[in-house]
């Protein structure tokens, strides 16, 4: 899940940053994706505000599937938030059997339609025998500490930090 949290910083979406990591039974990475503009399109050329941006953005789960290598049969996915119905279908169709989902909420309003979508996702999981596991995010800071300690040990923490700061600056954030 730590890798998913790090990957979501790459998203240029101004409201919601999601990421998805697909791994095999031995936890080897098969695919990585984050929500963002379609491939080959200049990021500056597309709308960044809803609802227009939705025509140009791809969800992290489908990007992870598109960017994957090898079979996803029997794989596990780590998603920073709850999957939508379209992404759930894509994951099931590609053989994902376990989904860990995290605390990042999408900016979708809590409407009867979004409640129905969540019920549909849970129903699909049940019907397809896909295990849904809510990631206990209360300890996510410990995960980040482990990741940063590892990156520091490998001597690449400053480079990763610089990439995150650069991403935040593009989004108008502060260091």
Protein language model features and the residues they cover:
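Zinc-dependent deaminase catalytic domain
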Residues: 1-175
